[in-house]
Amino acid sequence: MFRAAIGIVAFACATSSQFALADEDNGSSRRIEEVVVTAEKVESTVSDTSISITAIGEEMLEDLGIQNANEFVNYIPATTRDAYDIRIRGVGRNFRSLGGDPGVATYYNGIYSEDALIALTENGLFDVERIEVLRGPQGTLYGRNSIGGAINYITKGPTDTFTGMFRGQLGSRYNQEGYMVLSGPISDTVGYRLTMSDRDREGVQRGQYGTPDANGTNDTNTSLAIRWNPNDRSEMNLRINKRNSSRDIGAGTILSEGWGDFRGTRRTDVFAFGIRPVTATTAGAYGFTDPDTGVVAYGAPVRPGVDIAPQSPNPGFAGRGYLNGNGDSDFDDVTEEALTNGYNDEGFDQMGAQMTFSYDLGEDLTVKYLLGYGDFQYTYHFDYDQTDAPISDLGVSVLEDVWNVSHEVQFLWNPSPDFSLTSGLYYFQSDRLQDYRLRNATAQGRYTNAADYALWDAPNPYLGGITAMSTLYASIPWLAGPHCEIDTAPVGGACAGRWGGDPEGATYKHNNTNDTTQTAAFAQGTYNFNDQWALTLGVRWAEDRKSVLENRFYYFEFNLVPYIRGTVLDPLAATYGILTDPSTLTDLAFANVMMGAATATGDAESPITPTCALTAVECANPLRLNGGMPFSGGTKAVDEKTWSAVTGRINLDWTPNDDTLVYLSTTTGYRAGGYGLGILEARVETPQGTKPVSYDEEEVLHIELGYKATLLDGQLQLNSAVYTYQYDGYQDSVDIYDPSQDAFREIPTNTGSAVNSGFELEGTWLATDNLTLNANYSYTQTEYQDDVYLLEDDNPERPIQLFGEKRFNLKGGALKGIPTNKFTAWGNYVWDFETTRLTLLAAYSYTGEYNGSALERDFDKIPERTRTDLSLIWETQDRRRRARFFVDNVFDEVNFRGIGSGSHLTNYKLTGTLLDMRRFGVDVTVNFGG
């Protein structure tokens, strides 16, 4: 594939001269207007920049109605998005933890921003001059977290004369958006630009059975830009914004659930999820055939309180058997709807500032100082069980508080026409706090109320009047401990104690911090040997230091029965008239009897009767499902590490004529190591105590051959590139096999070497004076190169309770999140009248299927998707009045951004994140002044 792609570029180079010399009359007198970019810290055009870069200008953003991340990535080759991050050529963030970093750097007016989606959602991309997307490692000039590329958002600045704009949008689902701009001079040396936006839309996911709608918009933002030119040699640009968002966050889409004949249905008749091994003659038995070996085994639903199951009841129990769609694997009947208990709230309060001051020290030397500041709080309360049933209500609450500041000094030196040098120093500091809670405020009160240990705490005559629990205090002292809260554990240690209840019903909490500092120094110079050949060399040294704290609290169930079987258990059971035969009364069932949650029946198939009905909303002694006895636990871990690297760039340019550029580039990239904060198993014991698991830096070697040409006398533009990446220490979060424990653990780790190769092609053709056509295509192939073993526990056709754990070796498989094929085409046709203009636009995008997890399986692949948009624009010739009528996703395609699969713990639930379905509306703009 790689050699074939090189051949394509070589063919294009060989034929470019013929195209350039061709005097073909295609009926067009227009010429392609170059977009000026600052990809290499100095102004140049896309065609003159030896980087794979796509620049989306203001006109394209407005004409195509690009207003969010989902629409934006459709127009960029080899680019997709995750929940909070962007992937370029598959490089992104494979796991979301507080101690990790993104793989694509986000810049706002040339200054680093911590969160990609802050920039991609501000103002609905209104008042943006252009967006530059740089593909491939940008480790020399951009540095921090740009191992996959960089995205730079350039906003509009103050104008020399007074101008203004009002813009309003009305659309389906009561979408209402208002925008305003006022810009002009304050004095001869100072100018301003004030931009305001207010966006509001009701939830597009229709609440089912009278429940609230989800996925709405309620967003306001105000920004002020100031430009100051104190003299001819200096300029300062400052932009400050304040933003607030409070909305109903989108709910997950439940696509399927269940196993066996119940696959594609929602089980509301079982109190606890899980499968137990049984014989073929057991009531309710279902036969499974191992797809690998052909072995047949039988399973049946677990018996609540008898067989080990997840600690929370089935959230759909005694509720509605709701699925979005018909449960099929084609998802054709899925639509925008949700079923929740009504709390899907998201809040976002953000302030940012970017300041650039430049001073010309001479004709050939300019110094720049760049200051960046960001501060935001992000909160959400999310019902993630996709049901409104009253027995169990699973939810998550998050508060994330982020502060960051950056300083950069750049020196731009041009001592001669043949040589230029950009160098600088960089400092970045970030403090992140994340408060995270998993909760279930119903669940019959099992989490909100303090546990009643009943017979475990009752004085027993056989034991001389002491309690059964106290017989184990010497060997398990924490059994007597008080309720352990989130800040109880010592640093590097743990605490455990009785369950005292949590007012919110929290089963897990963490309060984590990550303080990050990066310092860097860089330089990149270009030497022109002659009019055709130029060499660029760049180097960057960077050091990252992370200091982390993870403070956890959790609910867990522990079974004491195995510790007292025999000499203590039998007489104890006899005292209370409890049978002890383990074939009749399992350890879990016995524990529930001792907890006062059940009574023994003597029936081997149904050995206990719950004290409270399973449908009871409240219960003083609820049936325990996992270990039988509830306790509280907590840990506190701290650590600090430093990573550093030297990265570089070597680039050779060949410019055979003014319209052609061929470049060969070798670049290295680096992403710092980090920690798996918030990942339950990501802990390690050391002589200094418990510490969070860390992972090493990720490095990449990137080689790219590019070709850019303007042909047909300025009416056709082609940009292409063929590339390969070689990763070392590829970062991911996987279930890996730990030989020392003979078990699988989910931890963040470096999975070794991986390769990623592909090619891209972008083109613009001014076909006639009225017709413009654009297209891009990308092809990507990826492969794990080292042995990485993963556990599969979420395949409903092969339950691990029946067939045991199955290990997969990822070696030779594809990396996740990367479509092999991606294609977009768009065009417009213009009718010019004396005072007005009418433009018809159409856009089509295709993204091929790709892996949603590290395992290559059909049932959780992200399906291929297509989208077609149409719009009609009426405007005056001076563009002072404008109306755009649009229909997005014309054919109402069902498209997904993500697919997630659960294990037996969630009854193999399959969920998806649905992209926008059909939308329509009108967008009106009025300009004044100038």
Annotate each PLM feature:
Residues T442-G445, Q726, N770, E834, ...:
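C-terminal beta-signal and adjacent terminal beta-strands/loops
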Residues R227-N229, L412-N414, S420, G424-F428, ...:
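Structural signature of Gram-negative outer-membrane beta-barrels, strongest in the C-terminal barrel
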